[in-house]
Swiss-Prot record:
It comes from Mus musculus. One of its GO terms (cellular component) is plasma membrane. This is GDNF family receptor alpha-2. Residues 1-21 form the signal peptide. The lineage of its organism: Eukaryota, Metazoa, Chordata, Craniata, Vertebrata. GO terms for molecular function: glial cell-derived neurotrophic factor receptor activity; heparan sulfate binding. Receptor for neurturin (NRTN), a growth factor that supports the survival of sympathetic neurons. NRTN-binding leads to autophosphorylation and activation of the RET receptor. Also able to mediate GDNF signaling through the RET tyrosine kinase receptor.
């Protein structure tokens, strides 16, 4: 009898601890309707193989052609087609940037999603698959050129943007595609037309889509301590052809123009998805992923919405498309909001700063946070050729990178760049780390308390 009672007690405690330690099971709503995600080209092939899906897809495309959302939803045949497609792989399909049939994939995506929202959304969902890589992956790939272990004084005085151009020239693919876009974007057509902008944009897209990020990022996001370096960074995309124009259009007009093209629309939506400032994360970036934001920014270069640095200020990071909000009328607030997603975006600013510093969220040391003050503006100077050294003329007293601050042990002031520098260094989180279930937290604590309260009663019962 005693052995039987002891066995019951042991079984009770074992089951109680198992229930506390095991993670909760997925909710039924999460399991319902789950299906593996495929790219839209493959999803279209799967749909075409099914007569019901194929016919409904054709119907929906006819419904979306030339009709607004309310008219489409009022049609029962259109509603039925939409309901069928919502259960097909087409509805959840996504695309990969730079994939072989990217344009076809995006056309399929927008053929379904373009007319399903009421009016024009400010932020559209990205048609691209989520980015899972991190900046630390880029750093590992670029370590051969990073100068790790070099003399700190030499590193502080070097022009990182010049070093990036030299590194590109050591790679055949990077050198070839860079030379191509430089040649095309610098080719004057006539006295009134300084270049063929369409061809320049195409050459830039090929460069940023086909050259690995460890080269392109170093040229776009190199850290600078002087004006010459910052001007070289600004000149990376040959802005006189690819970026600037005679007049600045209204930003909302530029956005509307961009959204008439499936590729431009997709890259803009992806930028908003990955760089939209989030105040629920430590870095101000969605999912604390700097790499996703920088990739989305680079992905817009070579389109109507091409962004660039607005000046050659080495201490301030301000980027913008070539537009303003003049003539916005009653849409001025929306226009300013759109423009500030570039000019005053803490996620984008922190991501660029982090890359220049060689830091990522899961490899950043902890540090204090400083209030920001406006950095002084510096006049532009002409860019320099790759073989000409334009090392810093400001000396080591002007330090804008986190690593330089830590290495030299200087006292921090309240400058804007230091605020940005330390903002992203306030965490040691690894986003990829697994969850740890704490036995004495939350509901587990309450459940354990209940179990322990019931234990004496059970022992009395078993002893009888």
């Amino acid at each position: 009898m005693i052995l039987a009672n002891a066995f019951c007690l042991f079984f009770f405690l074992d089951e109680t601890l198992r229930s506390l330690a095991s993670p909760s099971s997925p909710q039924g709503s999460e399991l319902h309707g789950w299906r593996p995600q495929v790219d839209c080209v493959r999803a279209n092939e799967l749909c075409a193989a099914e007569s019901n899906c194929s016919s409904r897809y054709r119907t929906l495309r006819q419904c979306l052609a030339g009709r607004d959302r309310n008219t489409m939803l009022a049609n029962k045949e259109c509603q039925a087609a939409l309901e069928v497609l919502q259960e097909s792989p087409l509805y959840d399909c996504r695309c990969k940037r730079g994939m072989k049939k990217e344009l076809q994939c995006l056309q399929i995506y927008w053929s379904i999603h373009l007319g399903l929202t009421e009016g024009e959304e400010f932020y559209e969902a990205s048609p691209y698959e989520p980015v899972t890589s991190r900046l630390s992956d880029i750093f590992r790939l670029a370590s051969i050129f990073s100068g790790t272990g070099a003399d700190p004084v030499v590193s502080a005085k070097s022009n990182h943007c010049l070093d990036a151009a030299k590194a590109c020239n050591l790679n055949d693919n990077c050198k070839k595609l860079r030379s191509s876009y430089i040649s095309i974007c610098n080719r004057e057509i006539s006295p009134t037309e300084r270049c063929n902008r369409r061809k320049c944009h195409k050459a830039l897209r090929q460069f940023f889509d086909r050259v690995p990020s460890e080269y392109t990022y170093r040229m776009l996001f190199c850290s600078c301590q002087d004006q010459a370096c910052a001007e070289r960074r600004r000149q990376t995309i040959l802005p006189s052809c690819s970026y600037e124009d005679k007049e600045k259009p209204n930003c909302l007009d530029l956005r509307s123009l961009c959204r008439t093209d499936h590729l431009c629309r997709s890259r803009l939506a992806d930028f908003h998805a990955n760089c939209r400032a989030s105040y629920r994360t430590i870095t101000s970036c969605p999912a604390d992923n700097y790499q996703a934001c920088l990739g989305s920014y680079a992905g817009m270069i070579g389109f109507d919405m091409t962004p660039n640095y607005v000046d050659s200020n080495p201490t301030g990071i301000v980027v913008s498309p070539w537009c303003n909000c003049r003539g916005s009328g009653n849409m001025e607030e929306e226009c300013e909001k759109f423009l500030k997603d570039f000019t005053e975006n803490p996620c984008l600013r922190n991501a660029i700063q982090a890359f220049g510093n060689g830091t990522d969220v899961n490899m950043s040391p902890k540090g204090p946070t400083f209030s920001a003050t406006q950095a002084p503006r510096v006049e532009k100077t002409p860019s320099l050729p790759d073989d000409l050294s334009d090392s810093t003329s400001l000396g080591t007293s002007v330090i804008t990178t986190c690593t330089s601050i830590q290495e030299q042990g200087l006292k921090a002031n309240n400058s804007k760049e230091l605020s940005m520098c330390f903002t992203e260094l306030t965490t040691n989180i690894s986003p990829g780390s697994k969850k740890v279930i704490k036995l004495y937290s939350g509901s587990c604590r309450a459940r354990l308390s209940t179990a322990l309260t019931a234990l004496p009663l059970l022992m009395v019962t078993l002893a009888q």
